[in-house]
């Protein structure tokens, strides 16, 4: 079988980095991009933070109040409201540069993409590394953004590799180095292996990649079911046959609502969410109609309700 070569591009602390590009003076300061809620004040959560802020424990998902507490001694800290229109513009500019290097380009999100470059580089990892560096250089030159790149024979390994030497990293995992590379990882480093899975394995005395590799596939299937068990069996060996699929960027419309007060009353929450969705539908349909007239094609209408209960 001809060797595939897959690149995973991952922009470093993307939202915060975009803000640094817009305002270069922020580069030496702790920067946190915030999702402010409807409650006003410091209610809301951190979307992302630059590495200076991360040194103080500020990370995605942390409440804004907690983040400000961690940075209380840094009077130069910047807490900025998320500007998704600007981030999308920066993403589109970057992705237009990146996709021209691919045989097959798969858009994952504003800050992430897969490229199959197998044919373009004639299945040569050295040539692939040159393309990766070319991508990094051109993106930096035209957008002032840095990105990290992982190169390997499959999507799973490339995604792990892109996060290996952040920020502004480039990591190559050739077929003969897969086993060695996997031994440097923790189980939770594998995409798709979450905390609950790691905990369940730990309960059986399985805490390392090596130990997981020694488990019979049928044991894993009995623990997690056929799909997940098979995935874990393959993933700890660096095996992934999923193809890079042509997927362009999508325009997503979203609206976030935060309750005025925290609640664990499911009847109240259900009623509130249903009323909110009913009120959103006419506006959303109107916006979709306008976008259709501009040439966008509507594929799906999905309502996703996330709950964050704190007891």
Predicted features, each with a name:
Residues 127-185:
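Long, highly charged, low-complexity intrinsically disordered interaction regions
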Residues 10, 57, 67, 111, ...:
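A residue-level signal for conserved active-site and pocket-lining positions in enzyme catalytic cores
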Residues 108-112, 152-155, 289-293:
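Short Gly/Ser/Thr- and Asp/Glu-enriched loop/turn motifs at secondary-structure junctions
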Residues 202-311:
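DNA-contacting surface of Y-family translesion DNA polymerases
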Residues 18-20, 44-47, 157-165, 243-248:
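Short acidic, glycine/serine/threonine-rich loops at helix termini
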Residues 22, 72, 162-241:
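Compact, charge-rich alpha-helical regulatory domains located at protein termini
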């Amino acid at each position: 079988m001809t060797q595939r070569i897959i690149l995973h591009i991952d922009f470093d602390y993307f939202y915060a980095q975009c803000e640094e590009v817009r305002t270069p003076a922020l580069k030496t300061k702790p920067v946190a991009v915030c999702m402010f809620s409807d409650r006003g004040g410091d209610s809301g959560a951190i979307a992302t933070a630059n590495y200076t802020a991360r040194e103080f424990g500020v990370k995605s998902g942390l409440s804004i109040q907690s983040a400000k507490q961690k940075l209380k001694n840094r009077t130069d800290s910047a807490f900025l409201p998320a500007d998704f229109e600007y981030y999308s513009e920066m993403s589109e500019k970057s992705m237009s540069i990146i996709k021209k290097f691919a045989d097959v380009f798969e858009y994952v999100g504003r800050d992430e993409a897969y490229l199959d470059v197998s044919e373009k580089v004639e299945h040569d990892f050295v040539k692939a590394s040159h393309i990766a560096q070319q991508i990094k250089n051109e993106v930096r030159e035209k957008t002032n953004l840095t990105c990290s790149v992982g190169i390997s024979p499959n999507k799973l390994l490339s995604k792990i590799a892109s996060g290996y030497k952040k920020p502004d990293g480039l990591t190559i995992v050739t077929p003969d180095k897969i086993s060695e590379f996997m031994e440097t990882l923790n189980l939770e480093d594998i995409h798709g292996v979450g905390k609950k899975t790691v905990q369940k394995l730990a309960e059986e005395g399985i805490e390392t990649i090596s130990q997981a590799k020694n488990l019979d596939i049928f044991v894993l299937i009995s623990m997690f079911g056929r799909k997940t068990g098979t995935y874990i069996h393959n993933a700890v060996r660096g095996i992934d046959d999923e193809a890079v699929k042509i997927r362009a960027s999508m325009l997503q419309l979203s609206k976030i609502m935060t309750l005025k007060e925290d609640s664990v009353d499911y009847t109240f929450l259900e009623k509130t969410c249903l009323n909110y969705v009913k009120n959103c539908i006419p506006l959303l349909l109107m916006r979709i109609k306008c976008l259709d007239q501009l040439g966008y094609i509507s594929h799906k209408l999905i309502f996703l309700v996330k709950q964050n209960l704190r007891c």
